């Protein structure tokens, strides 16, 4: 499917692809997709949505646009990835589309906002339900300092003819689907409700499909409860979603906690305007029990075998990225900024890994927005390959041809009176494993 612009691209059973054909000029908006289309194996369009807004930018022929960005979901699948018994429909059904509209809301700022909206679109391409993020600002729990920063600078982007504030920047959206919490009587987790995350505000929340109101949230403040403090600051996150009920961990929430920069607060040395005020130079993948508000599984630099915080940035993608729970209980992680996709077991062993060799033309990086694993049967046009196990290299002993043998030294002597290092007290920075004085 050469030339498609899906962000993400999602393969459906039968060899179909849900994607987009391009973007609006960056002079006039930010990350506005022209349309959302479903194409077959031969590239024929079998479904299309673009009638969100008619756009007539200067010097460009007017046209209808979806203004889609970052995510979409087809009825039948809550997350867009494989879960037993939860296949997306390919010839019918509604589609949730994450999109943009410009907005004004003096409660947030006197500046124009690039607002996130969720559109439910039927098979005929008609919008049958919609939700507007800015209308629920009062439900999000911003403190006074972050509100003041937002009012001054709602993540301003210098578009024409008037700039706009990409104030929330929702980057994932999915339906909860059947789950054990709702089965136990917790209405916050109604199967029709929708979970989203806003990377610019460091917030994850669930929307009631019936009322539009926020029923559950984590952030933007992580100092307001013992549970939030224990989880720790989630910064610039991506791909928050509820694990489908037919997969291990069903009902828990997965999120790629990027770190990097995100959130609004009072100005500080790392964020002199108060925008992107929280900073961290490593990433975490978290699985959270949304009722107990506790981390039940994680993959962080510590689980990856790196000494934190000194070596934490060896697992780090400050933007994009995601993860997928697999039927075998493993987790497929996209460390997006480096184009790395790898599968880890519940006890954090890497059992499969891929690094993209492809770099972009205009952005010379091998970044990968979000990877998905699908069953071979979903793409019947391609013969099922023979899987071959590969023994992982031991990088501590591996040598390229012609290099000296491991451990080969000209001479080794002992010096009388030398004392060995004892623990991490040899380092200038305390590790996360060092005990704190309580």
Regions found by a protein language model. Name each.
Residues 1-438:
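Histidine-/acidic-rich catalytic cores in large beta-rich domains
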């Amino acid at each position: 499917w050469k030339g498609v612009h899906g962000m993400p691209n999602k393969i459906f059973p039968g060899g179909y692809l849900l994607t987009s054909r391009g973007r609006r000029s960056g002079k006039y908006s930010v990350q506005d997709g022209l349309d959302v289309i479903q194409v077959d194996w031969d590239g024929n369009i079998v479904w299309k949505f673009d009638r969100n807004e008619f756009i007539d930018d200067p010097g460009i022929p007017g046209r209808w646009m979806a203004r889609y960005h970052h995510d979409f979901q087809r009825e039948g699948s809550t997350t867009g990835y494989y879960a037993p018994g939860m296949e997306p429909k390919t010839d019918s059904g509604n589609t949730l589309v994450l999109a943009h509209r410009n907005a004004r809301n003096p409660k947030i700022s006197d500046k124009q906002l690039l607002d996130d909206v969720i559109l439910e679109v039927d098979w005929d391409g008609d919008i049958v339900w919609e939700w507007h993020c800015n209308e629920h600002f009062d439900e999000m729990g911003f403190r006074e300092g972050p509100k003041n920063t937002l009012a001054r600078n709602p993540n301003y982007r210098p578009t024409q003819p008037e700039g706009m504030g990409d104030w929330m920047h929702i980057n994932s959206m999915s339906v909860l689907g059947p789950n054990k919490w709702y089965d136990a009587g917790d209405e916050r987790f109604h199967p029709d409700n929708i979970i989203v995350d806003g990377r610019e505000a460091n917030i994850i929340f669930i929307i009631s499909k019936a009322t539009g109101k926020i029923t559950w949230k984590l952030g933007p403040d992580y100092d307001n409860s013992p549970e939030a403090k224990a989880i720790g600051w989630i910064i610039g996150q991506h791909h928050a979603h509820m694990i489908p009920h037919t997969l291990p961990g069903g009902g828990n929430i997965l999120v790629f906690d990027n770190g990097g920069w995100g959130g609004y607060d009072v100005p500080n040395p790392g964020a002199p305007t108060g925008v992107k005020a929280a900073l961290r130079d490593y990433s975490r993948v978290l699985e959270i029990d949304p009722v107990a508000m506790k981390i039940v599984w994680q993959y962080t630099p510590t689980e990856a075998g790196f000494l934190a915080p000194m070596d934490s940035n060896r697992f780090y993608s400050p933007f994009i990225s995601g993860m997928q729970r697999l039927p075998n209980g493993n987790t497929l992680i996209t460390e997006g900024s480096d184009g790395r996709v790898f599968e880890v077991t519940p006890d954090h062993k890497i059992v499969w890994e891929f690094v993209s060799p492809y770099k972009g033309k205009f952005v010379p990086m091998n970044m990968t927005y979000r990877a998905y694993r699908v069953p071979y049967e979903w793409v019947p046009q391609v013969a099922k390959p023979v899987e071959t196990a590969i023994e992982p290299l031991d990088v501590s002993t591996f040598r390229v041809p012609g290099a000296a043998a491991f451990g080969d030294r000209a001479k080794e002597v002992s010096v009388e009176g030398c004392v060995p290092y004892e623990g991490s007290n040899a380092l200038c920075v305390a590790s996360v494993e060092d005990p704190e004085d309580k």
